[in-house]
A protein has these predicted regions:
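A hydrophobic, helix-centered structural microdomain
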Residues: 1-65, 155-180
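A short linear-motif detector with a strong N-terminal bias
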Residues: 26-28, 39-41, 71-72, 101-106
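Hydrophobic structural segments characteristic of membrane proteins
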Residues: 46-50, 55, 81-180
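Acidic, Ser/Thr-rich low-complexity segments on the non-lumenal side of membrane proteins
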Residues: 56-92
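Residue-level signal for short amphipathic helical patches enriched in basic/charged
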Residues: 27-30, 74-78, 94, 145
Length: 180
């Protein structure tokens, strides 16, 4: 019973944090969103599977992978519209990687990731930009599922900053999920 109460508390704490941070970031980043909207047109909707394998549409800008557009992609600014998904409760800041509807249905390993909200940042994303060996996306998502909690999320979020700034396969980050 105590475990259920703690898990529920973690869920509500995480959801509240997600909502407040997404709201604050949207208030600060609206000029960037407006500029991206003017340059790249309207947001695209990508069908994904979310918590409990419920379908949802992830918002993002379609950005070419050439020229100056690489900077937008490298800084992941094209994913800023996903803040609206976080506000709606479709996504979280930290969680397993969002899964495309098609491949997820075929790959039974992804059934494991359906009990958590997909995240803007995930363990797989950090590991793919660092020197950490890992078995793959599904294994990273399953590992996150087993260790999910506020402490784990803070550890992943802290590792996301150097992975974003320096992540080209040469970033040194600790091989533990939890840094606190």
């Amino acid at each position: 019973l105590a475990h259920r109460v703690a898990a529920r508390w973690d869920t509500w704490l995480k959801r509240g944090f997600d909502f407040l941070l997404a709201t604050a970031l949207l208030l600060v980043m609206w000029p960037v969103l407006l500029l991206l909207r003017l340059v790249y047109g309207p947001m695209r909707r990508y069908p994904q599977l979310g918590r409990w394998c419920e379908p949802f549409e992830e918002f993002a800008f379609a950005v070419p992978e050439s020229g100056l557009h690489r900077v937008v992609r490298a800084l992941r600014l094209h994913r800023l519209p996903a803040l609206f998904n976080i506000l709606r409760g479709d996504m979280s800041f930290v969680g397993p990687r969002p899964v495309n509807v098609g491949p997820a249905v075929r790959d039974r390993l992804y059934r494991r990731t359906c009990s958590a909200r997909p995240g803007l940042v995930c363990l797989h994303w950090i590991r793919s930009r660092s020197n950490i060996d890992f078995e793959g996306e599904a294994a990273s998502d399953a590992e996150y599922e087993l260790a999910a909690g506020v402490r784990t999320d803070v550890g992943i979020a802290l590792r996301a900053v150097p992975a974003l700034l320096y992540g080209s396969g040469d970033t040194e980050v600790p091989d533990t999920v939890s840094l606190l």
